[in-house]
Amino acid sequence: MIDVLFLGTGGGMPTPRRSLSSLLLNFKGCKILVDCGEGTQLSMKNAKTGFKDIDIICITHCHGDHIIGFPGILSTIGNSGRTNPLTIIGPKDITRIVKGLTVITPYLPYELNIIENPMQKLSFNVTKENLKLESGGELLIDTLELNHSIPCIAYNFTVKRKPKFNREKAVNYNIPRKFWGDLQVGKNINYEGRVYTPSMVLGKERKGIKISFVTDTTPIDSIISFIEESDMFICEGTYGTDDDIDKAIKNKHMTFSQAATLAFRGNVKELILTHFGVTMERPEEFLGFARKIFKNSYVAEDRMIKSLKFD
C-alpha cells in the first residue's frame, strides 16, 4: 500500500485555501516528497507527518512555486534528528540550484545525494534505516522531460508486487522446506550440488501500483505512453476552461480538458487535478470540463489523502 498526501495544490502564489505545489508519498513508513513550494512545512505540521523519515525529495523544476520551501525543509529534517543520507532527484541544473539554496543551511547533519536528470529508472529497496538506491528494488522511479519554460520533468512511482509463493512448484522441485523462505525473498541457494532459484517457488508476475505526477508543461504526446495504465495520474490543471487556452499555450501549462484528454488516452484509472491558478478560487466548479472527457476526474485539496492498495 502507498499513501498519497496532497500538501499543496496551488500554483503561482499561495492562497488562503491552498499552499503551493507539494506532494508526500508514504511507502512502508519511508517518505518521498515531490516538490516543496511555499507552505509545505506548515501543511506537513498540520497533517502530523513528521520530517525525519523523508528519504527522497523529487523536484519537477526550479520555479519558485515548486522549490521555495526547499531550504526550510532541509533544515527541519536536520533538526528532527536525521543522520541518514537524503536523496535529491531533479531536472537538469538541480545540482547548481541545490548548492545555491543550501547556502543558508550549510551545517546539515546528513549527506545530500543529488541525482540530476536521470535517464533511466531508479530502483530503491526499503531497509531498516531508509529507502536505499540499489538494483532489483521494490520501488521504481522514472522520469520524463516535459515542455516548460525551464527544464522540467515528470515522475512515475511504481511499487512492484512480489509473485505469490507456489507450494506445488516447490514440492515438485524437491526443494527442502528450510529454504522456502529465503527463496521467496529473492535469494539463490546452493545446496548439495544443486542451485535453487526464486523462480522455482514463485508464481506469475503480479501488477503493482503506479502513480504518475505531471505538472508545468504543455500536453506533449510522450506523456501518454509515460502515464499508461497508471493507477493515479496527478496532473496540473492551471486553467479551468479552454477559454484560457491561449494563456495555457503562452505559459506552457494545461487546461482541465487537456489534462483529461491525456488521462483518457493514457488509459489511467483516475485523474487528480492540482496546481490551480491563483484566480481559480473553486476548481471544483470547472470539474465538468474534465469529466466530459474522462469520467474519473477529481480535484485535489490541501491535506487530502488517497491510499492505493494492490488489486
Swiss-Prot record:
Keyword Lipid biosynthesis: no
Keywords: Endonuclease, Hydrolase, Metal-binding, Nuclease, tRNA processing, Zinc
Cofactor: Zn(2+)
GO molecular function: 3'-tRNA processing endoribonuclease activity; zinc ion binding
Catalytic activity: Endonucleolytic cleavage of RNA, removing extra 3' nucleotides from tRNA precursor, generating 3' termini of tRNAs. A 3'-hydroxy group is left at the tRNA terminus and a 5'-phosphoryl group is left at the trailer molecule
Signal peptide: none
Coiled-coil regions, chain positions: none
Active site: D65
One Pfam family named in its UniProt record: Lactamase_B
InterPro entries, per database record: Metallo-B-lactamas, RibonucZ/Hydroxyglut_hydro, RNase_Z/BN
Keyword Transport carried by entry: no
Residues that coordinate or bind Zn(2+) 2: D65, H66, D216, H275
EC code(s) of this entry: 3.1.26.11
Binding site for Zn(2+) 1: H61, H63, H148, D216
Record text on cofactor binding: Binds 2 Zn(2+) ions.
Protein role: Zinc phosphodiesterase, which displays some tRNA 3'-processing endonuclease activity. Probably involved in tRNA maturation, by removing a 3'-trailer from precursor tRNA.
Quaternary data: Homodimer.
Sequence similarity: Belongs to the RNase Z family.
UniProt-recorded name of the protein: Ribonuclease Z
Organism whose genome encodes this protein: Clostridium novyi (strain NT)
